[in-house]
Design a protein with these regions (language model features):
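Flexible, small-/acidic-enriched active-site or ligand-binding loops
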Residues: 128-132, 147-149, 173-204
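A short, Trp-centered hydrophobic/proline-enriched beta-strand micro-motif
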Residues: 112-125
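Short beta-strand-to-turn element immediately C-terminal to the catalytic PLP-Schiff-base lysine
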Residues: 96-100, 159-162, 171-174, 196-199
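Alpha-helical interface subdomain recognition
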Residues: 1-80, 99, 113, 140, ...
């Protein structure tokens, strides 16, 4: 499989990177962290730039790109540690686009920024795919969803619930009666909430395996968020090793430091390739549960190790929050748990260990 990026994809990467460097300085992100908020102003500019529409069909107002292109965008956002729900809205929007009922009619609103939906999937069991919440005959939802990223800032929640014993997606106005959000303090300092629904009005937008598909996409993109955090840490660590002097020379000239940087680079590269391969499989229409789980397991296992190696090279200088390194350490560790930890993803692979695959 050829995973070399095309000229257009490299241009997309560079465009997103330059945009974020100009529009999302780290001091601005620090203030948002302190306020436990999200960057609504930056989100408006992101919508205007069309970055969100990369992986949506032209009929819905998108640019007709691939999921691989979306993954490149998500990685760049992770490399800047910005406080916007790019992954969450992309997953919810793609789920709406795939729905056979009312979902596709709402996608143009998502791409225009009028609708900011985020997935609400996890329940008390904290296991993806374990959906117990049921829609009432009156068309309302009563129950709780846990760890809803940006749940308190979204305009709508795309809630996974059961309808007649089958999983389906329901769109709930986050400001409607019966909806209350309980903000949580997260490891990565990104907004997350427990959302309580008390006879909240809900509109069915589709089913037919949409929940499982959303989990696969979210998991693959979360792997690239891990990669983005690791790459940012690697870049900063190499730059520091080349400028920090000890014993009359840059510490990057010492073999032990070089080994740390080399180990970081090899982990980042392998995790990125697995994640891009998983997205390519999803682009081809495969369910790709094993590929996606392998990508997320690798990224989730590598992230804490790579990020800690970065801190070892930085020494005490990497501990203070005036150093930007902490952005990526906290976000990377958080993303390593989001959408499936190492253990959860390995369990997915173990459940399918006897299935035939075409890539071994």
């Amino acid at each position: 499989m050829d995973l070399d990026l095309s000229e257009t994809q490299r241009l997309l990467q560079e465009t997103v990177r330059r945009f974020l460097e100009a529009e999302a300085p780290f001091d601005r992100i620090r203030k948002l962290e302190a306020d436990q908020g999200w960057d609504a102003g930056l989100w408006e500019k992101i919508v205007a730039q069309g970055f969100l529409g990369v992986a949506f069909g032209e009929a819905h107002g998108g640019s007709g790109g691939r999921l691989l292109d979306l993954g490149l965008v998500v990685e760049e956002f992770a490399r800047r540690a910005v406080m916007v729900p790019i992954l969450e809205v992309a997953v919810a929007g793609r789920a709406l686009q795939a729905c056979s009922e009312l979902g596709p009619s709402r996608v143009p609103e998502v791409l225009a920024g009028a609708l900011v939906p985020v997935p609400a999937l996890l329940e008390v069991s904290d296991r993806f795919g374990d959906v117990q919440l049921e829609i009432a005959p009156s068309g309302t939802l009563t129950g709780t969803k846990h760890f809803v990223d940006y749940g308190q800032h979204a305009t709508h929640h795309l809630v996974a619930a059961r309808d007649g014993g089958q999983e389906a997606f329901f769109l709930v106005d986050a400001r409607a009666r019966g909806v209350s959000c309980e903000p949580l303090l997260s490891l990565g300092r990104t907004p997350v909430a427990v959302v309580h629904y008390a006879e909240a009005p809900a509109q069915r937008v589709g089913g037919e395996g949409g929940v499982a598909a959303a989990i696969r996409l979210g998991r693959a993109l979360a792997a690239l968020q891990c990669v983005g955090s690791m790459q940012a840490s690697l870049d900063q660590t190499v730059a520091y090793a080349n400028t920090r002097e000890q014993f009359g020379q840059a510490i990057g000239r010492f073999q032990a430091v070089r080994h740390h940087c080399a180990n970081m680079a090899s982990r980042v590269t392998s995790a990125r390739l697995l994640a891009l391969e998983a997205l390519s499989a999803l682009d081809r229409g495969e369910e790709a549960d094993v590929r996606v789980a392998a990508a997320k397991a690798a990224a989730s296992r590598s992230a804490p190790e790579v990020l800690m190696l970065g801190h070892q090279v930085h020494g005490g200088n990497g501990v203070i929050e005036e150093n930007d390194l902490y952005f990526f350490t906290l976000r990377g560790k958080e993303r390593s748990l989001a959408w499936g930890s190492v253990e959860e993803c390995l369990a997915v692979m173990a459940d399918r260990v006897d299935e035939e695959v075409d890539w071994l």
